[in-house]
Amino acid sequence: MELIIISGRSGAGKSVALRALEDMGYYCVDNLPINLLPELADILSTSQQSAAVSLDIRNLPHSPETLDTLLQQLADAQHQVRIIFLEADRSTLIRRYSDSRRLHPLSMQDLSLEAAIEAEAGYLEPLLQNAELVINTSEISTHELAQRLREFLKGKPDKELKIVVESFGFKYGLPLDADYVFDVRFLPNPHWNPDLRPMTGLDQPVIDFLGKYSEVNNFIYSTRNYLETWLPMLEQNNRSYLTIAIGCTGGKHRSVYIAQQLGEYFQAKGKKVKIQHKSLEKHHKKNSA
């Protein structure tokens, strides 16, 4: 199995890095006692799950030889261990600690902040020497750090954005998870056709009814183009999910049809898309009760 060890200076961004790896699908453990690493790797190897563990000054062995022995033990068990070391300039670390008002782990030894930063560098030297990747976070944002990690681990700069396209009814309230909300209540309403009223936007007669209106087709086309314009930037911006909500009055006809059309379009483009119809689920539960 693949085991990523995130280590480095306190205040250099290990927690940010661990969250980024969690978004990439790694099983993440923060500050695991180092003697438990082989046991964790053995347990997770049965499910073929990759893992990431953060190690800092608090859970490192006192002897460099102990670290070497553990790494060799993992290698002998056919685990792929990769060490990523996060560094930052002394002035940057001092500023970050000043801004956060947190104590450095070595401050408990009655060291000043500058002395603690200096002492920590010596303790971490064995990990630095074994690191496959060293990143200085002094001048980069959290998004840039996450992107560098993706490039290193996955071989590509952008992770796959998961898109959720959902329909809803305004009378049930706005969906709390929506990033974008599009109101389609101004479009022709099949509800006023007695034959179409019991149907939904997934039924062919409703599809034919809405598909004949140019304003419906123009709305789908314009919304599709808008999303296609900005999707590349959203994919680069360290997002895991994008939720697009389409709403009409009851969430039964217009919003269902348009959400389905948009979702299927982006699926055909190779995007990872989930289509869901929130208010249809309410109608179904109501009718089956």
From Swiss-Prot:
GTP binds at residues 56-59. One of its GO terms (molecular function) is GTP binding. Keywords: ATP-binding, GTP-binding, Nucleotide-binding. It comes from the Bacteria. Transmembrane segments: none annotated. ATP binds at residues 8-15. Pfam families: PapZ_C, RapZ-like_N. InterPro entries: P-loop_NTPase, RapZ-like, RapZ-like_N, RapZ_C. Displays ATPase and GTPase activities. HAMAP family: RapZ_like. Belongs to the RapZ-like family. This is Nucleotide-binding protein MS1718. It comes from Mannheimia succiniciproducens (strain KCTC 0769BP / MBEL55E).
